[in-house]
């Protein structure tokens, strides 16, 4: 689910923290990808006849097709993807998972009614609501990635939290997910629409976390409290508090505790036994992968094993799989060229108070080449 209304709130309150990017701008970047979100995207994708992709045995294979081709697309653009799979959900998420189960049961009833009435639009709509990523989907995608030579990580808990930890540790450049709670976990850069279908022609949205906090004038802890007020997976929220009011209250009072002290509880009651402190703790100190043990390596695809798995077992076209292998190998040859900015380290900006020896035209040169940390161009 992520954080309710956070993307729109950022667009309204801190638009310069968002940039629209083309995939080619991430050449040479290592990016941690929320695997569950990807698989869900692939599973809800349908063919023109309205059916999910299946093999002759009736097994769903759309997750494998999506994982294969979207991964190749990233590799062709010089991106080094690492997929991060969800581990065991935290206990606090049990309430949200229970609600999802109830929504699935309701969707099953509505689907049956739509099928009886022959309403194709509603059949498609409610069928998508019943899509669930299973352990088999996870295992098959892990096998596929291994055969493609692409690394993956099994997170101990939430994938987005481990993605954020990898970014903080400098192992990868960004987190790629559609869920905005990657920012709540503190990822320095969050990318949306990286794994979206090319047919949708969606520009990649790049969120800069440091710039976001600067623009909304909140600390990370205050931002977490804001996200809890907006609505997250771990607990309820105060009734009748919308996004604009939530950020105003955090700016005014600084924390949920102070808000509860000053708000009219008869108009805006908090949930009974509200576990906001526990939710805050999960965002601040999540259970994540030990980044010091992570050694990311991309290798050549195992073409024979890929053909056995994808063609003999899953009945994909052998020509297409072979062609995909050629693209992976070609991308590996191109990826030996690094990003120019990886050869330099910015150690800090020059102090304006410090006098430097001046030569003719030096002021102009400084203006052209000087870099100030934390400044980004507003996306078009």
Swiss-Prot record:
UniProt: Mg(2+) 1 binding residues: 34, 86, 158, 160
Record's keyword terms, sorted: DNA damage, DNA repair, DNA replication, Endonuclease, Exonuclease, Hydrolase, Magnesium, Metal-binding, Mitochondrion, Nuclease, Nucleus, Phosphoprotein
UniProt-annotated location(s): Nucleus, Nucleolus; Nucleus, Nucleoplasm; Mitochondrion
Cofactor: Mg(2+)
Cofactor binding remark: Binds 2 magnesium ions per subunit. They probably participate in the reaction catalyzed by the enzyme. May bind an additional third magnesium ion after substrate binding.
GO biological processes: base-excision repair; DNA replication, removal of RNA primer
EC number per UniProt: 3.1.-.-
Source domain of life: Eukaryota
Positions with a binding annotation for DNA: 47, 70, 158, 231, 233
Signal peptide feature range: none
Region of interest (Disordered), residue spans: 348-380
Family stated for the protein in its record: Belongs to the XPG/RAD2 endonuclease family. FEN1 subfamily.
Chain's role: Structure-specific nuclease with 5'-flap endonuclease and 5'-3' exonuclease activities involved in DNA replication and repair. During DNA replication, cleaves the 5'-overhanging flap structure that is generated by displacement synthesis when DNA polymerase encounters the 5'-end of a downstream Okazaki fragment. It enters the flap from the 5'-end and then tracks to cleave the flap base, leaving a nick for ligation. Also involved in the long patch base excision repair (LP-BER) pathway, by cleaving within the apurinic/apyrimidinic (AP) site-terminated flap.
Subunit structure: Interacts with PCNA. Three molecules of fen1 bind to one PCNA trimer with each molecule binding to one PCNA monomer. PCNA stimulates the nuclease activity without altering cleavage specificity.
Protein name, UniProt field: Flap endonuclease 1
Species of origin: Salmo salar
Gene: fen1
